[in-house]
């Protein structure tokens, strides 16, 4: 079961990823985790990636793709994997096709959790955090009993700067522009499966399980 998981910020990707890997016993492979593991193991590619990250620069595609190749070649990926955060561009998607071809495998599905921008705005701008204990609330989905007061410690709640409407809107627009060519690429390949992420978390996962039901565990 070889899967790629996509979705805009706030679509609920993380929650669904946890359920998929728990149920199907495949590793959840995120770009960040791959970089951290490669750097910890001090592989040649890991050290190259570290040199860019330490300077605050983007890791070049050739290094990222090399790290992905190393990771997908490990034993725990023999029964499949869930890729999250890679690929981000069509060039990376084409490189992934080459990697899998060399391994004698193909992608089964690219699962795209779709939520419209207005709903994502509501989800992302509604978050509030306690200044004192760090507890997280949501004005719509998980509000505190008393407005702007933490239920746990009585601390004041605040909105992070990057959760304000203008910043969130810009972030979503950037992500939309980046992912559209990738979604088109996978749609043309026949891998793309759009899942309605506006539903309740359990219903979203039920749809994913229905999709994966035809694949061998």
Swiss-Prot record:
AMP binds at residues 31, 36, 57-59, 85-88, 92, 160, 171. One of its GO terms (molecular function) is ATP binding. It is found in: Cytoplasm. Residues 126-163 are annotated as: LID. ATP binds at residues 10-15, 127, 136-137, 199. PROSITE patterns: ADENYLATE_KINASE (PS00113). GO terms for biological process: AMP salvage. Pathway: Purine metabolism; AMP biosynthesis via salvage pathway; AMP from ADP: step 1/1. Residues 30-59 are annotated as: NMP. It holds the Pfam family ADK. GO terms for cellular component: cytoplasm. Zn(2+) binds at residues 130, 133, 150, 153. Its main location: cytoplasm. The keyword Nucleotide-binding applies. NCBIfam families: adk (TIGR01351), PRK00279.1-2 (NF001380), PRK00279.1-3 (NF001381), PRK14527.1 (NF011100). Monomer. This is Adenylate kinase. It comes from Bacillus pumilus (strain SAFR-032).
């Amino acid at each position: 079961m070889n899967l790629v998981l996509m979705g805009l910020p706030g679509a609920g990707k993380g929650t669904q990823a946890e359920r998929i890997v728990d149920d199907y016993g495949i590793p959840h492979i995120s770009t960040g985790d791959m970089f951290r593991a490669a750097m910890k193991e001090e592989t040649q590619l890991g050290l190259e990636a570290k040199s860019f990250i330490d300077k605050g620069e983007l890791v070049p595609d050739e290094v990222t793709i090399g790290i992905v190749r190393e990771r997908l070649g490990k034993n725990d990926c023999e029964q499949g994997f869930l890729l999250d955060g890679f690929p981000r561009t069509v060039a990376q998607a084409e490189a992934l096709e080459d990697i899998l071809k060399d391994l004698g495998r193909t992608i089964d599905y690219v699962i795209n959790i779709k939520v419209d921008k207005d709903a994502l705005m509501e989800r992302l701008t509604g978050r509030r955090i306690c200044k004192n204990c760090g507890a997280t609330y949501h004005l719509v989905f998980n509000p505190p009993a008393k407005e702007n007061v933490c239920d746990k410690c009585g601390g004041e709640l605040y909105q992070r700067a990057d959760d304000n409407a203008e910043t969130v809107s810009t972030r979503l627009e950037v992500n939309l522009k980046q992912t559209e060519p990738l979604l088109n690429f996978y749609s043309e390949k026949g891998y793309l499966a759009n899942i309605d992420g506006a539903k309740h978390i359990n219903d979203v996962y039920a749809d994913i399980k229905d999709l994966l039901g035809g694949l061998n565990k």
